[in-house]
Every structure is written in C-alpha cells, then in structure tokens.
C-alpha cells in the first residue's frame, strides 16, 4: 500500500489511545473475549471509540480529535462508565498497567482480524508476547515537514516520557527490576526503537518506499517505532508510555506531550541532526531500567544528567506553552510526581513489599481504575 499524502490537521490538536487489560475475577488473569465487550458497548459510545487491539485480552479506548486535555478527559470518562458497566454485566473487570504481572503469553489469542493475522504470520510468537498495554498520543501538525521536526524534537524526551509513565515492573510472575518492562517486549522486532534518520517529509516518503520492499510493511501501522508520523491523521504519534493506572495520569501524560509539541514547533529550539540519536538507546535503557532515577548522557557534550533533574527542567521550559493550550494542570501534577520521586511502578512494588500478592495487585489496579 503506498504511503498516503500527509493530511493537514490543526496544529496541537490531540488524540489519545489507551490499551486496557480485560481480566477475570477472582483469579484476575487476562480474559480472552474482548470482542464480547466491544459488541456490548459499540452502540452506547457517543464520542470516541472502543475497539480491538492485537489479542483478545486487550481493549483499546480512543478519543476523537480533541482541542485540549479537558475535552479528552470528558470523552474518556464517558467511555469508562459504559465499559465498566458492560464489564460488570459480563463478570469482568478492567485495569491499566503496562504488563499483566503473571500472564502467560502462550495463552493469548490473536484477534480474528486480517491485519493482525497477517502480523502473526510475519512475527510468530512475538505477537502473542506483545500482549502488553501502552498509551499512544497523537499531536496534530500542519505539514509533513513539521511532523518530521516534531518527531525529532520529541525523541529527545523519550526517556522522560518512559520514566513518568512507568507501570510494568512485573512480568511472568517476576519482578523484572525494570521500572517499565513493557518496552523490552519489542526489542526483537526489526523496527524497534527510533525511526531511521530523515530530515524532511520527502526523505520520509523515500524511507517508507524502501521499507515496503521487505513485504513486511504494508502501511504505517505496521511500523513499531517509538514515535512515528501518521500521515492519514496528520499527526505525530508517541508510543513509548505504559498505560497508566488512572485516567487522570493518562490525561496528564497527554498534556505533557501536547505542551512539549507546542514548545517545539513554536520556539524551534533545536537544529536536529543525526548525531542526536547516537546515545538514544542508552538513554532509553536508563529510563526503562531505573525510571526517574536514571541518568541520561548528552551525545554532543558527554555531560551526564539525572533524569529527575532534566525532567524538572523540561517541565519548566514548557510551562508557558502548557498555559496557552490549557494543560497547566497536567504539568503541575507531573511536577509534584517528579518531586515526590514516585511513579506507578514503585507504588506496585511497595504493595507487594507490604505483603500483597500479584493477584491482589491486579485486583487493586481494577479498583483504582474504577474509582478514578
């Protein structure tokens, strides 16, 4: 399929996707029939969309195009109410978090969808292992060239986004010692990590043509980069965050990305170059392994900075942009989180350290999601 032309969209508009876990009480393992829930709610959603993701234990909630985080929060709140009622009617529960703490990938059933079945054929068991749950945020752009500039700018802050959203320390019944373990799942994919370097949209079109020769890439949706342009929407899509445990944190993360995008495209503070990515995977690893306690390294100067310190610096820089787009509440909430030194991964570990079981942890996550 050829790459579509870049659809011009209103700059800084917002779209958010949340991949949710569908679980069976009282054991709280993943359920394998999200199709039943989708059928139950499809005529009751007035804004946004509830749809499939890769496997039958995943339920995706997606907003429409929103002007700001308040509109997105309203849509999510309405969807949440409908989905929770349908889940209760079918004796199921819903929760966030980047990984199910004790699920077995071998049990996961890929959705009966042509694209997902083709992906299963291409990638085999990797697709079943990819039953992990993330938050994706789209930001509108006026042109393809703006999208490429924004993608490179946002890539500088991938460690910050990962650390702030970290919510997957447990996998296969084990403490992984990572703050988010979810990003590691994609390391075997040939398109894992950052997009290959291009400097403008014309070069991106050439890149996509080259990738399509592999026969594994039929559309932009087949690319698993940390951040990717979405020409059919006219957006840049950030894909590195775990699904948070609460709607409020999901909205705050979206506000952070929207405000950062506004700052990047209005101030143009960087002259991007390929060398910017020299230490990308090392800095990304620091955020995954240590969360906010990680240390990132500047590829140009060799300077090393605590991620906590650099995140506070970012929040300060984007505060005026956040004010202009109505996202100040998100930046203030994230500032409090950074100062506290906590993320959701640490809260999960604290629950287990206090004697809680992993089954009890998932039960707690369901209560948190329903109560937010």
From Swiss-Prot:
* SUPFAM superfamilies from the UniProt entry: Glutamine synthetase/guanido kinase
Disulfide cysteine pairs (residue numbers)? none
InterPro entries recorded: GCL_type2/YbdK_subfam (IPR050141), GCS2 (IPR006336), Gln_synth/guanido_kin_cat_dom (IPR014746), YbdK (IPR011793)
- Which Pfam family, giving just one, matches this sequence? GCS2
Its UniProt entry gives the catalysed reaction(s) as: L-cysteine + L-glutamate + ATP = gamma-L-glutamyl-L-cysteine + ADP + phosphate + H(+)
Which GO molecular-function terms appear in the entry?
A: ATP binding; glutamate-cysteine ligase activity
Nucleotide-binding is among the record's keywords: yes
- Which sequence ranges are marked TM in the entry? none
Assembly information from the UniProt record: Homodimer.
Functional note: ATP-dependent carboxylate-amine ligase which exhibits weak glutamate--cysteine ligase activity.
From the Swiss-Prot or TrEMBL record, give the protein name.
Putative glutamate--cysteine ligase 2
Organism from which the protein derives:
Shigella flexneri serotype 5b (strain 8401)
